[in-house]
Amino acid sequence: MNQLEIKLAAFDLDGTVLEHNSSWVAIHRHFGTEHNGAASLRLYTEGKIDYREFMRRDISSWPKGVTREEIAGVLSDYRIRREAPEVFRELRARRIGTALVTSGIDILARDVAADLEIDHWVANGLRFDGNGKLLPKGVGRVDPTRKDIAYQRLLSKIGIPSKKTIAIGDTIYDLAFLKSARLGFMLAHTTRVPDPEIIHINKLTQIFDHI
């Protein structure tokens, strides 16, 4: 039963649907450029650079001539959270649409959406030239701290009001996104959720206790 008439369930990707925390960190780790990513993250969180500049610095720190194939190979080694397939099957059975809203990378979002039969996704993009080589400037669609903006844009496109949606994330970066839905859930191993409006869950399946 869908007591709240929920039409869409939107999920963060890294750390929520997937077990790992960041597709960007996975690529930095592969190329040995974690220190560059950490430095850019610090500047971003301190408000000294915006997210587009953060992306540009991340991408520029990777080796020149990197190909789409290599990036896709790094991102293909992902682990879907154990209960996630069950959750998406149940949402389909209830005729509730599904979406990913992630500040991660579109290559990964597209693959996970296909694996789990997720209806919609929005993510940040990498750009490649005609030979498949990485270009230094990405496509910024989802600011980590303002996922709600990308989410509202998606909802407007598909014609669903936010009051008929739920949102699920796992970090403080997701707060604006979670609060923009009818119900917001934070997947966390601690019971200390940083906002009283957000519902704490230990497993994704617990969203069904509330809808």
PLM features per residue range, with description:
Residues 68, 72-106:
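Short, acidic loop-to-helix structural element flanking the phosphoryl-transfer center
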Residues 122, 198-207:
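Short acidic-hydrophobic, aromatic-tinged amphipathic segments that line or gate anion-handling sites
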Residues 1-52, 56-57:
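Active-site neighborhood of HAD-like aspartate-dependent phosphohydrolases
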Residues 54-71, 128-135:
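Short, basic/glycine-rich phosphate-binding loops at helix/coil junctions
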Residues 26, 83, 107-111, 176-177:
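Phosphate- and divalent-cation-binding pockets in alpha/beta enzyme and binding domains
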Residues 111-165, 195:
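Substrate-recognition "cap/lid" segment bordering the active-site pocket of phosphatases
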Residues 85-93, 147-148, 152-159, 179:
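Surface-exposed amphipathic alpha-helices with a cationic face
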Residues 98-103, 162-202:
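Acidic, Mg2+-coordinating phosphoryl-transfer loop and its flanking beta/alpha structural elements
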